[in-house]
Design a protein with these regions (language model features):
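Short linear motifs at protein or domain termini
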Residues: 1-90, 94, 204-227
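Generic alpha-helical segment signature
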Residues: 1, 5, 81, 97-100, ...
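Conserved amphipathic alpha-helical segments that form helical-bundle/coiled-coil interaction surfaces
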Residues: 77, 98-159, 170-179, 187-197
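Residue-level recognition of short, well-ordered coil/turn positions
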Residues: 20, 55, 119, 184-185
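Short helix-capping/hinge motifs at transmembrane helix termini and TM-loop junctions
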Residues: 93-94, 139, 162-163
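A short secondary-structure junction motif
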Residues: 15, 19, 141, 150-157, ...
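Mobile beta-alpha loop/short-helix "lid" or hinge segments that flank ligand
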Residues: 51-57, 152, 164-167
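C-terminal regulatory/effector modules of DNA-binding transcriptional regulators
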Residues: 35, 163-227
Length: 227
C-alpha cells in the first residue's frame, strides 16, 4: 500500500519539531525513505511541502536541509500567534458547534485534573489539543490553517514546556470556554488575548533565564510558546 505524501510530511515535520533533525541537518531522500519505510516519491513531495511551510530549505550542493530560524523570526512567530489566536476565539464564540463545546469542556476538565496531579507531560498535550479545538471552532479554514502552522513552528523553535502555574492556566482556558459557550465574542477575544499575554510574559522571563531556541546561532535565550 502506498503511503500518502501528507503522512510522510507529518512524520518528517514531527521529527523536526521534536529535534530529531536539528537545524541545518541534511535531509536526504534516501535516508528519509529508509527511516519511514516508503519510496522516495512521497518523501520528495513531503520535502516540497515542508519547504513551503518554512521547515526545510534547499541549499546548492547540499540539497534539502532543516531550516535555521533566526532570533527575530522566532520572536515574530510568537507575536503573530498572540495576535491571531484571539481572533479565532472570537469567531469560535459565533460559530462553534455543540460538538466543539463538548470537546473543549472535556479538555478543560482533564487539564484541571492533570494540573492538580502535577502531570506536566499530559498538560502539554492537552494544551495543544485545547488550542487546536478552539481554532477549529472558529469555522475559518484560513485561520485554522495558519494557527496549525504557527503551533507547529512555535513547538519547533521553542522548547515548549507546561505552564509554570498550570492551575491558573487551565482556569483561564475554562473562562475562555465559558465565553465561547455564551456566544460572547468580545469577551472570548479579550480573555484569549490576556491569556496569550500572560504566556508571552512567562516566555520573556524564560528568555532572560536562558532557555535555547532551535536556531543555528549559539546561546540564543528563548524557550516556550503559548499554553
Amino acid at each position: 500500500m502506498r503511503i500518502p505524501a501528507h503522512a510522510v510530511c507529518t512524520a518528517i515535520r514531527d521529527d523536526i519539531v521534536t529535534g530529531v533533525f536539528q537545524p541545518g541537518a541534511r535531509l536526504t531522500e534516501e535516508l528519509l525513505a529508509r527511516r519511514y519505510g516508503v519510496s522516495r516519491v512521497p518523501v520528495r513531495e513531503a520535502l516540497r511541502t515542508l519547504e513551503s511551510e518554512g521547515f526545510v530549505t534547499t541549499r546548492r550542493h547540499a540539497g534539502a536541509c532543516v531550516a535555521e530560524p533566526t532570533q527575530q523570526e522566532a520572536a515574530d512567530l510568537l507575536e503573530l500567534r498572540m495576535l491571531v489566536e484571539p481572533l479565532a476565539a472570537a469567531r469560535a464564540a459565533r460559530r462553534r458547534t455543540d460538538a466543539h463545546l463538548k470537546v473543549l469542556r472535556g479538555l478543560v476538565r482533564l487539564g484541571q485534573e492533570r494540573a492538580r496531579q502535577g502531570q506536566g507531560e499530559d498538560l502539554r498535550a492537552l494544551g495543544g489539543w485545547f488550542h487546536e479545538t478552539l481554532s477549529q471552532a472558529s469555522g475559518s479554514p484560513g485561520l485554522i490553517s495558519l494557527l496549525t502552522q504557527l503551533r507547529h513552528k512555535v513547538a519547533w523553535m521553542y522548547a515548549v514546556q507546561a505552564p509554570a502555574r498550570p492551575a491558573e492556566s487551565w482556569a483561564e482556558h475554562g473562562a475562555i470556554v465559558d465565553a465561547v459557550a455564551r456566544g460572547d465574542a468580545e469577551r472570548a477575544r479579550a480573555l484569549t488575548a490576556a491569556h496569550a499575554e500572560r504566556a508571552g510574559e512567562a516566555h520573556r522571563m524564560r528568555l532572560r533565564s536562558g532557555g535555547p531556541v532551535r536556531t543555528s546561532q549559539p546561546a540564543v535565550n528563548m524557550s516556550s510558546g503559548l499554553h
